[in-house]
A protein has these predicted regions:
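NAD(P)-dependent Rossmann-like dehydrogenase/reductase catalytic/cofactor-binding core
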Residues: 24-130
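Conserved Rossmann-fold dehydrogenase catalytic segment
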Residues: 1-2
Length: 130
């Protein structure tokens, strides 16, 4: 989840986490929120083993499931990922700003894929930035 979602927003292969301190910072923010919620629920993430901490060896160009869904113009599993963590955070009074931003960005990308922001036929339409 912590690498799947930011990669989908950026639209880049997973190598972005080795090549960008910014992508690493976003991933770490998501992971910290996940770990805080898990700890509050009595779940010991450290029991998941070393593999989950370092991940699997994959080509830098690999695209995880959420990005594959967006590429194919399908709706994603964001409600099961960030959506669930946001709900749990509210129940536990834990702030989840990284997950909230990620949730809304991916939902907006889904809307874009659905054609919501296609203004090609609206050349004369005016809007105001608020």
């Amino acid at each position: 989840m912590c690498n799947n979602l930011p990669q989908a927003i950026l639209g880049a292969g997973v190598g972005c986490y080795d090549d960008s301190i910014h992508m690493k910072a976003i991933s770490d923010g998501l992971r910290n929120e996940l770990e805080t919620i898990a700890t509050s629920k009595g779940i010991d993430i450290n029991k998941s083993g070393e593999l989950s901490k370092r991940g699997s060896a994959v080509p830098a160009s690999s695209r995880y499931s959420t990005l594959q869904d967006l590429d194919a113009k399908r709706h994603t599993e964001i409600d099961m990922f960030s959506g669930a963590l946001i709900r749990m955070g509210k129940e536990l009074n834990i702030k989840t700003p990284y997950n909230e931003f990620t949730y809304h960005m991916i939902k907006a990308l889904e809307e874009k894929n659905d054609g919501k922001f296609d203004y090609t036929g609206d050349k004369d339409k005016v809007t105001w930035a608020k």
